[in-house]
Amino acid sequence: EYDDDAVDLALFSNIVHLATDDEGVLRYDLSNGTWLTPWISTGVNGADNVPVAVTGDILYFGIPGYGVARKDLSTGELMTPLTELSNSPGQGTSTSILPSDNIYALEADGSDLYIGTNNGAVKWDGSSSSSFQTGRNWDTRPQQYFDFAVSGGTVYVATNIGVCAWSSSQVSSSDPDCLNVYDGMPNWATYSVEADGYGYIFGGTTSGVGIITASPYEVIGEWEAGEQTQNAPVEVIGD
């Protein structure tokens, strides 16, 4: 059943397509009598940044102001999007998991997907989500999650208060360990983070890159930009 008036109808390859005023294009499979995921407009135009990630056969792309759209690459079908907790346009609560629909980062790690927003982060395993836990003190309570790097069972996150680290198996049950300017980072907000295979983590800020060791978890130096860069993206390639 559907709640909106159909304004047009078309049949293609045993799929009925119903055009509606407010709910997009509803699709009904006549072969098995089931409703498919509707085609719904995101309502977003001219997005400045759309992060993408792939886990298995599923392509994810974060659309600011909408959520995380999903496509099954094996079938070509669009899937139910991941949306904000308070924004569930007939999709059901199992995919309304996001703390915000302003998506900053997506990072795939095996079958897991890390989603960073301007008001928290979640780990999605394909069927359920875990919200990132934060501490009680300001220096362990990040709000904005700009980038992720996963290495050695630890998730490193570029946040508005520096580089924060969680155990990848305990993101929802343990407080993060965060490094900021008081620990030697070049600036507060860290917009990019990468980890290499030698136990080093690199956090990019608007004033340079902080060089961090995984054990002990501390800042050991920095690469200074010399001037404000607005952003210092980092990437590790081989050695």
Model-predicted segments: where are they?
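Short loop/turn segments that connect beta-strands within beta-propeller blades
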Residues: D29-G33, D72-G76, D125-S128, S167-S172, ...
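Blade-level signature of beta-propeller repeat domains, shared across WD40, Kelch, NHL, RCC1
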Residues: F202, S207-S215, E235-D239
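Generic beta-strand structural signal
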Residues: L11, Y28-L30, V54, K71, ...
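Short coil-to-beta transitions that initiate beta-strands within beta-rich domains
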Residues: E1-F12, P38-T55, T83-D109, F132-S151, ...
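Loop/turn residues immediately N-terminal
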Residues: D21-V25, P64-V68, N118-V122, I161-C164, ...
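Conserved beta-propeller blade signature
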Residues: I15-L18, I58-F61, D112-I115, T154-V157, ...
